[in-house]
């Protein structure tokens, strides 16, 4: 969150100019399967599970394994260090010894996961919520504070535990929260069964996402896979849990220790929750699948009128699971914002095709109110030397639609924001269109023709001035008597229509960017905008749209 405040969870400010690429360190090398070295942009940065905040016109990324980076333009990044990255044992050694450390996982260095940072106005401090991970889900989220967002950091204490049972319960704050007293026979005297079941409430205390709601209250979501995503209230005076708030035990809704359930559960994948507010809606982002290159990691979107939910997708499917959904990364719940795409606007090479995109944060910059999605991605055919995978942090602009959803821009943000069309003539023309299929993902397997499963390639459509959408080459009218086509001459097959929107739709005011697209019997609400292509920087008209719970992208060819 920005120090200068805003109505969103993490508001931001923008600044012109950029960190000089020469300050970002040398360009790194990655290798494709054919042995060709791929030189990465020196302004790029690899921060896993990136959380973004802003202070005084500078953007900061914080990620897993204490990686930090900063930028003045969200394009050119440089790494930086602080006392947490240099010597984590000095800050976290005691809590590591007290809870997560086990013989099966003895090193703290690989177990500092997914921090998030927020400005606490009451404390006058930056608060970092960091996961200290252990085997068997014996993890703890801790609080660190700093006067400046780049550090140095001071350890405050634990916020929430996971992986407890009767043998170690008294080493946590669970008895305090549940108001338990030790029994004379050594038993707990409380049914902990639900905390031992991965299909119930046995979660991993990782992936903290602090949030400041519109009423000024601080909350924190957390959790990973298994038992779902939960949220409880924080005390703004301490930054720790608000122990005065009690939560009832209600199946699939609330838990006395973990608070309010907002998503997932029943062993269904789902982690990396994040929230942002826009036009009276709270939007929940979370990642389905597994984070590896072939794991199908992907961002799904839900919304609610309340920070605490209930969250649903466009088709009304709840974010909370009420039963097992095997391979839910291949199912239709949640709007999939991005996928693996290869088209002529870029990326053109498989070494640059994004796969396994996820664990995002989001930010609103105070300069103009524009929102941005920040996430990490792996690549179809890019591997670090000595490692089987390579990853980067990427940024895309988030665009609100006229029916109250958010879509991601078709091209990565490289300094140029989305520019609205000035009229119909800007929109008409040929488009390459890709669909972010919820039911498939890049898994490393190849078809008989050598193309990868799960990499989406475009279909060519033409948007006509009269509102028709056609596809393909000219077809003889007499060869298609059963096509029910609105034409009486030879020509391309009409497969849809489009029209600009004006006035108000579902309570939202439309602008020149808003349009309705009817394509293959699905109605999409679209945002048209000029953006530079990734492959060459050429400005082209694009659109991002949502319909029937599915996102599509289009780019003029």
Where are the predicted features?
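Carbohydrate-active catalytic/glycan-binding domains of CAZyme proteins
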Residues: 1-557
